[in-house]
Amino acid sequence: MEMDLNNRLTEDETLEQAYDIFLELAADNLDPADIILFNLQFEERGGAELFDPSEEWQEHVDFDLNPDFFAEVVIGLADTEDGEINNIFARVLLCREKNHKLCHILWRE
């Protein structure tokens, strides 16, 4: 898979794309109670944070997760308004190269 460093989503575009995918698929993958909690609390304590892909993804995909081209977006709630997300609803793995649409999601169990 050949990728171009000059044809990548920005960090903001990556976050936005991951969040849009999360919203589209959440109803099919989360408990109704979790969806209600997320919707009620997101404005005050919710967030999406961008990271390099964690090692855990190697258990789920069979390709190299070069951080130049892949990002992990953690979506969830924090205990406080400015706190770190610790109540995770989904972890989204995205390819940032615009010509390679690839997404994997690990949902809250």
Curated annotation (Swiss-Prot):
UniProt-listed Gene3D superfamilies: dsDNA mimic, putative
Gene giving rise to this polypeptide: yciU
Family from the record: Belongs to the putative dsDNA mimic protein family.
Pfam families assigned to the protein according to its UniProt record, in alphabetical order: DUF440
Function: May act as a double-stranded DNA (dsDNA) mimic. Probably regulates the activity of a dsDNA-binding protein.
Protein name: Putative double-stranded DNA mimic protein YciU
